[in-house]
């Protein structure tokens, strides 16, 4: 009985010892398996890499610090630039010509010529390329009523302003009428004024429209009463702008 009891206890002790050894071994194995990938990941996180997997070398310590922290320098954006050519355009302002009536100013106040347009009082406005243009013209007029008496119809005056083109592909023939406007003015007489001219009157003739023009064609203005043109600021002008 005594011998058997000791033997049974010894067997149980040996079994418990084997179990403890097995548990300790398994724990060590799991710890080792977890430690290896964690160590590898930590090393990879500390090594600077570019997008292709190669380590980049820079002489700038600040750049090295940025790369080590995982920052990337973005490329600088170039400012947007409109490289398309400007459309031909012109705006001319009426100016008096000595002994010739109406002339045109190309540089003063709001007047301009752009993108190859040219102008001369002798030949008119020349446009540099074929296209659809919007042409416009406004001519201001002023005058005085004649002395009192007489037929009212005899006091009426018809003011006419026209745009013509000539030259270029159109040829050297007779100029072609493009656009025209007209206004008839009948000054009101002052019954009390029997002698001398009446008060000043003012009016304007304006028009505009789309015209297909070719390179080299010249556009000019023709008016019926150059001695009545109003040259005050903003009263008389003409121009063109390419729209297609």
Swiss-Prot record:
This is Lymphotoxin-beta. It is found in: Membrane. Residues 49-244 are extracellular. Spleen and thymus. GO terms for cellular component: extracellular space; plasma membrane. Residues 88-243 form the THD domain. Keywords: Cytokine, Glycoprotein, Membrane, Signal-anchor, Transmembrane, Transmembrane helix. The keyword Cell membrane does not apply. Changing residue 109 to R: In subunit 1; reduces binding of LTA(1)-LTB(2) to LTBR and abolishes LTBR-mediated NF-kappa-B signaling activation. In subunit 2; reduces binding of LTA(1)-LTB(2) to LTBR and abolishes LTBR-mediated NF-kappa-B signaling activation. It is a single-pass type II membrane protein. It holds the Pfam family TNF. The chain crosses the membrane at residues 19-48. The lineage of its organism: Eukaryota, Metazoa, Chordata, Craniata, Vertebrata. Cytokine that binds to LTBR/TNFRSF3. May play a specific role in immune response regulation. Provides the membrane anchor for the attachment of the heterotrimeric complex to the cell surface. Isoform 2 is probably non-functional. One of its GO terms (biological process) is positive regulation of interleukin-12 production.
């Amino acid at each position: 009985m005594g011998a058997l009891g000791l033997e049974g206890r010894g067997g149980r002790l040996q079994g418990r010892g084997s179990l403890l050894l097995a548990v300790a071994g398994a724990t060590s194995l799991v710890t080792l398996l977890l430690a290896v990938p964690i160590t590898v990941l930590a090393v990879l996180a500390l090594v600077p890499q570019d997008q292709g997997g190669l380590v980049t070398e820079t002489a700038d310590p600040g750049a090295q610090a940025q790369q080590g922290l995982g920052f990337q320098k973005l490329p600088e954006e170039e400012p947007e630039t409109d490289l398309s050519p400007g459309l031909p355009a012109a705006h001319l302002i009426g100016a008096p010509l000595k002994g010739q009536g109406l002339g045109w100013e190309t540089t003063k106040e709001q007047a301009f010529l752009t993108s190859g347009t040219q102008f001369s009082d002798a030949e008119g406005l020349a446009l540099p390329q074929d296209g659809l243009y919007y042409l416009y013209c406004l001519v201001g007029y002023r005058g005085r009523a004649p002395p009192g008496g007489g037929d009212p119809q005899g006091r009426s005056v018809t003011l006419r302003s026209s745009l013509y083109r000539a030259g270029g592909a159109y040829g050297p023939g007779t100029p072609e009428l493009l656009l025209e406007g007209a206004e008839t003015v009948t000054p009101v007489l002052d019954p009390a004024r029997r002698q001398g001219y009446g008060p000043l009157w003012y009016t304007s003739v304006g028009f505009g429209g789309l015209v297909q023009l070719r390179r080299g064609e010249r556009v000019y203005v023709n008016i019926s009463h150059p001695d009545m043109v109003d040259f005050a600021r903003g009263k008389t002008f003409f121009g063109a702008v390419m729209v297609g």
